[in-house]
Amino acid sequence: MRVVHVIESTATGTLAVVCTIANRLAAEGHEVQVIYSARDETPQNLHALFHPDVVLLNLQMKGPSLASTLLGLRRKLIELRPDIVHLHSSFAGFLGRLSTLFCLPSTAFLYSPHCISFIRRDVGRMKRYCFAALELLACVKSCTYVGCSESECAAIQRYLGRPAVLIENAVDRTVTARRDWNSDRSHSKTMQRIVTVGGIRVQKNPRLFAEIASSFNQDGTEFVWIGDGDPDLKRMLEEAGVRVTGWLARTEVIDAVAQADIFLSTASWEGMPISVIEAMTLGTPVVASDCPGNIDTVRHGSTGAIYHSALEARMLLKRIMDDDVFRNALTRQAREEARDRFSEDRFFNNVALLYAAKLKGIRQRVPA
């Protein structure tokens, strides 16, 4: 089977998902290509993240000319003639479908938005419907939507009137192999470290992170933002006493989350956050905002804590710091659930079965 992944957002959770699928496919002997765009936050060691047999092809998708980008992507996909094209993130999903109109009839197309655009909470209803209109335009090309959470699938059905196949995200084996790290650490120390991971952008709500950080005594609590992004928002975080690390190598991110006392998500919207799943798997208790994606991942009071305001977040953080019984219960239940629900094997098996079903359906409709 020849599979091509198209990814414009080549960083963080979306990249982690593509790596997992591509590497497992390549290890099983399938032919895998990844067409990607490089961003400022794209890891410098990108090639090292993939199986040696995965072929990486650079194509900058946010160039000066949309027409030239569409034509370039069309030419590349026709040249590769894949059995499966899997599009990742909204922009790649839009380009990938429009660029292949009236070609590749024997290819099955799948599209994983990884947090579809009309889930956004920073825009009004009219703009969300504009996003939906663009999605409907791209739907001229037959393609299977793959949602990563119940919230995302529900949004696709609501705005587009189309079903989506639910395949929840997962973490790769480099994380699950180290899930006992955090349980061995002492949490009675004087300095508590609270971390988050991601780009410094509106979606991750750094203003809320700064507000929560400012409410704590900096002598006893350290807030860390692992990532980089908007300079003004970064400055605001630093003025609130937050340490911003910049982009780190994946192994360094895993180390930092594993050694943290609490993982704090302040996101305003998510698909299904890989960083939260990784924290759960590593045994770092999670305190997360009540946004789409987070509420699909964390079960309040069982596998983590969900808050509705900065004040409630502070109260939950303090309780986890002060109440070892509560903390240990959250950690234990989160790790147990993550081991099965968010396992790489479960995720890849679901993806592989979907690929096989869609390819079989295409071949039955299109004569060889």
Language model features with spans:
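Aromatic "clamp/platform" in nucleotide-sugar-dependent glycosyltransferases that forms part
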Residues: S268
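Short His-centered aromatic/hydrophobic patch
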Residues: L87-G93, P113
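N-terminal strand-loop element at the rim of the active site
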Residues: H5-A67, A155-Q157, L166, G229-P231
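Short hydrophobic beta-strand element within catalytic cores of glycosyltransferases
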Residues: P285-A288
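Nucleotide-activated donor-binding/catalytic signature segment of Leloir-type glycosyltransferases, i.e.
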Residues: K234-T251
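Conserved acidic donor-binding segment of nucleotide-sugar-dependent glycosyltransferases
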Residues: H300-L311, R319-V325
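A conserved mid-protein helix/loop that constitutes part of the nucleotide-sugar donor-binding site
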Residues: L15-T20, T196-S215, W225
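Membrane-proximal helix-turn-helix segments that form the acceptor-binding/catalytic region
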Residues: R128-Y145
